[in-house]
Amino acid sequence: MGDLGFLQWEDPYEWTETNHAARNHAIRYENRIFKHIAHASGSERELQKEKHAYMAAYGRMNTMKPIRIPQDNPHILISPRLQVEGVYYWKHVRDPKWKYADDLDFWSVQDAPYVAYTQDVVVGKLDYTLHVKTPTSHWTHKKNGGDAVAIMNHRVYFIEGDEPLQYNRLVSLSLYTGQQRKVIYEEKNPSIVISLVKQENRTLFLIGEDAGYQRLWWITPTGSIKRLDADGVSFKPVGCSKDDRPVYFVRQGDFTKPWTLVGHGWKLNREIERSGIDFCSMTQNVLISRHQGVRTVWNMSTTSEPKRLHSGFFTPLPFTDWPFWRGESVTTAPIWVRGPSRPPYKFLVAKSEIYVDSEKTRPYAEETRGESMSPDGLRVGWLLLTSAKSQRKPRRLMVAAYGAYGTSTNLDTTRWIPWLDAGWAVALAFVRGGGDSNESWAELGRMSGKLFAVGDFEACIKDLQRRTDCGPEHTCIFGRSAGGLLIGNLLSKYPTGDLFHCVYAEAPYVDLLKTASNPALPLTEYEYKEFANPRKGPAEFEQALRMSPIHSLPAGGAPGVHVLCRSGKNDIQVYPYEALKWILTLRGNREDTSKILHVNSQYHSTYGAEMYLEYAEDFLIINNWLK
């Protein structure tokens, strides 16, 4: 039973939370059903064929040459990895063995290399250990924390946490010994998340975020901390000026205000002032803005208006910042990006001109950009991908969306390459709530605006069906994590298959009411202003109830829709009992093998060989359902 003091409600599947033995028994039963459906959907030979297709697709993405640090006389090599355990692999130039890292930084003392790096205790657990490899030894910090690490003036900066996902204490330590620990800042408010931001010429910032509303601190070269622009609500740190002042963009007062650039003299235009900002470099005079998923590269100047150099669907890759942070060969450093239709590529900006080096990476998809009108009159962007190998019209349609936390839609479509090759169209809907435009766009999708984001998604699906001639019987929708609120609410609205015939879900957030009512869970208090706080009173309880997919389903479940759902047993972001509750509710108290769930032993994401196998199984099952 849910009990908030002022209100109680019955939860028929509460046992999935409290009775571990019963839950584990139910999960084993669901896993057996899932494997039976998977085996019936294709032979072992077909399964292995699709698994190898996924391995080949991801292999094509990991073709980047190792990065040399320093560039001219390298001490270490770094190999960025995509969609594998860890984000990077690194090693000393004379060391045959590569180590994985989630983040790392490099410092040279008298031409001797020091490398600070973080590693997840178990891949996917989100509980990171700080390591420092010195020329003669290795030390490990006793406290775990977040994944980011930075070195500045012989000190290592790291955010500690007492529990995974609750990182709240910025500390610095001696680079050489790991001793002399100093607490730089500790966040006491449980709803605020803090994170390190490394910018140009080793300028270090700390950002605190509370449902999109931000605070910015500058970590000075001496290791002190200074709050910047207390009236600012949104920030984009840039670096440090020639007179050693912090440079940053700020929106003052509210999200509708234009960007102001503090500490530097670039001229801005209205488009930049209103857009989100992904990247900027004072040395290269480059800025990358975003709107409705589209990024624009600008050449910036202190004397003339910004010059538009390039636009398209792409996002800068994390390691693009490295040469700018280190201040090494910044004027010629490439900007690495990835798009939704080709492997990662780079571009170079020099003398207000751009060279896009994408000719060597052949596209695997054709891109079509469009907009849909949401029921409240708001225009919502989308991107449609079709196979570059075939001119035939697509036979089936997959539509994916996320729309939460101000996080940009993932443009990595590697997982969809086998689907495109099989004649599917794959679409991304840039619904409100996400970070595909500016901060106002994200704010429009928070709290009660989440249901408007569902309307955005619905409008995009209908227009994409008209564009592709793929009706509901050939349409599948995909949502992961907080994207589960979108697909779950649409499924509650169309349980008989009138809009789509299939739902594909990974770690879906579908029991918002119960999760948001439990402050003991690691993310609950962070999310009160993103979704709702049912404990606050009847108004927000009703809001959470309306947005919670499990509670908005009709009594008969969803008899007209196939659902494939995956979760991880050790997931602490979206606990696996949410997916189990949802599947049981979708069946409407009847035997129904068109709703299936598999729970593996991993965390919020699946990695390695198991990921390829799961993707292959899902591909065969859904293609069998949507013949």
Which residues fall in each region the model found?
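Short loop/turn segments that connect beta-strands within beta-propeller blades
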Residues: 93-95, 133-137, 174-178, 220-223, ...
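Conserved blade-register residue in beta-propeller folds
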Residues: 89-90, 132, 172, 218, ...
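Active-site-proximal cap/loop segments of hydrolase catalytic domains
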Residues: 431-627
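A flexible loop/linker signature enriched in serine peptidases of the S9 family
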Residues: 80-87, 119-129, 143, 159-169, ...
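Non-catalytic accessory segments flanking enzyme active sites
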Residues: 22-107, 193-196, 227-244, 248-261, ...
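Cap/lid segment of the alpha/beta-hydrolase catalytic domain
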Residues: 104-107, 359-473, 480, 515
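A conserved hydrophobic secondary-structure block that centers on an alpha-helix together
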Residues: 96-153
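Polar, glycine-rich mid-to-C-terminal structural blocks
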Residues: 175, 179-187, 192-199, 203-206
